Amino acid sequence: MVAAGGCAGSGADKGSAAGSAAVAGDDIRGAKLTFVGDDAFAPYRYLETQSDGKQKVVGLDIAIADEMASRLGFSYDFEPQDFAATLASVQSDDKAFTMAMSSNEEREQTYDFTRGYYQPLVGVLTLGGDPVKRVEDLAGKSIACTTGTVQNKFIAKVMPDADIHTYDGGDQCLQEVLAGRIDAYLCDGAEGQSMRDANEGLVLGLLDRSETSDHVGVYRLMAKKGDGFVAALDECIGEMLEDGTIDDCIKQYVGADFMWNGDYSASGTSTAAGK
């Protein structure tokens, strides 16, 4: 995949942004990277049928990665993998990265992260009934999570005695709920929004950030610890936040309720050396 322009509707001045990011991106210019990740993680990454009948991976993460590639002069291929395989691939390949990852002390021993580009909400998908909007409303329910995700770790921490079932991917969790074998799928809120819209009868509740913010951080780009290109990508993300490009992408792929709207205080900083 070769980089294309930014999100539709962006009014940002791409010329000045590209010039400033290029200074930090000298080491990445001309590089060929690999973006690994789940391609069934809408609205971040998902397959869309094109006019020629072929399928193409699109979504928020792809749009942001394309724009970074355009500004910094690198290219990348997307390689679909489930969550567990993604972590191993990034750890073993100094040209690989993934996105929609939260940082924590354990992960920071092995990986470097950019600042955050997106603030997630935790969603709860159920088949019918009232939307689950509080953690206490999950009491007595069987809960599905994708193995190793922040949602998985969050619920295991706050409800250690809950009936938690883990699966390799979000699609498996969804099918368990649709089949009535599991009561609730604890997921990324925007992912849950896409799944609800595509499946009649699903109900989505969003947990308040006051209950989740200590456990579920901003989404970042993640690469192997010590990879030199992380600093350039981090600076580029900072510029894209400031010039409104990322909010344009969020509005297009997720919705206006999830935009930063000028307050980037929660985006944090990069974990890369020297940042």
Where are these regions (language model features)?
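Periplasmic-binding protein-like
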Residues: 39, 118-126, 197-237, 256-275
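Ligand-binding clefts/hinges and TM-proximal coupling segments of bilobed small-molecule sensing domains
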Residues: 9-10, 15, 153-168, 204-208, ...
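A ligand-binding cleft/hinge motif common to bilobed small-molecule-binding domains
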Residues: 84-88, 101-110, 154-157, 183-215
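Extended ligand-binding regions for polar small-molecule ligands
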Residues: 8, 62-71, 149, 216-257
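Extracytoplasmic small-molecule ligand-binding "clamshell" domains
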Residues: 15-101
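C-terminal motif of bacterial Sec signal peptides marking the signal peptidase cleavage site
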Residues: 2-6
